Amino acid sequence: MTTQTDSPVLVSVRHHTGVLELNRPRALNSLNPEMIGIITRALEQWRDDDSVAQVLITSVSPKAFCSGGDVRHVRDGILAGKEEEMDRFFTDEYSMNHMIASYPKPYVAVLDGIVMGGGLGVSAHGSHRVITERAWASMPEMAIGYITDVGISYASQRWPGSSPAMGAFIGLTGYRLTEADMMEVGLATHLIDDAGDFIEDLVGLGVDNALDEHTIEVKEEARLAGWRDDIEATFSHGSWADIDAA
């Protein structure tokens, strides 16, 4: 299974790995309806294909994994009176997020560079969230008056090192998580030395062997570790008025 090289998502099967490569670098891989459709169809096909043992999602560009949903597409659609079409865009995106969260096979997201908004939607719900030292993440939607979506308002409270207060902090502030922060709260499951080498071993040896070979330790303490007590004290309240007063 392959797609043409000008597709916004390159789809292939390498050995026993279904590979999704986000291929819209000029737009920092922001997700549009075509990309969501391609990813969804590939995942549906591989789910019941015994020859595919695992799924990899990555980017062709080292600058960005994915900068989020295509906000310009949605804005232009609303202004053009295409409300139902834009509603369908979000329905399809959220359905894809749910599919990833419940996927029965290892779903390995390799995150290098920018990971924002919808980029977390196609990565943070998977079984393996593998980052490099160049990765950083945020949910910046509050800055444009939008909710923390793509399931992250739920997931960010439940990552192994997170809490409801930490999830509220991440969503309400749009805080930019470093690679150390991503490991601290459990958004990332593994930190690796090199994305390219890891991917080659993932395809050739399987995810567990590749992680054994390439996982490294975090080199510096996460900022969130030092702020954790203050975040819990401030963002554990149930309303913005109470948070602001704290």
Located regions from the model:
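Hydrophobic/aromatic residues within transmembrane alpha-helices
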Residues: 57, 70, 122-123, 182
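Glycine-rich beta-to-alpha active-site loop
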Residues: 100-144, 169, 179, 190
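Conserved CoA-thioester-binding segment of acyl-CoA-metabolizing enzymes
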Residues: 1-58, 98, 244
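Short, flexible helix-coil linker/hinge segments at the edges of structured domains or between repeats
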Residues: 84-88, 130-162
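A glycine- and small-aliphatic-rich helix-loop capping segment at beta-alpha/alpha-beta transitions
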Residues: 69-79, 125-132, 153, 159
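Contiguous mid-protein beta-loop-alpha structural module that forms a pocket-lining wall or clamp
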Residues: 151-206
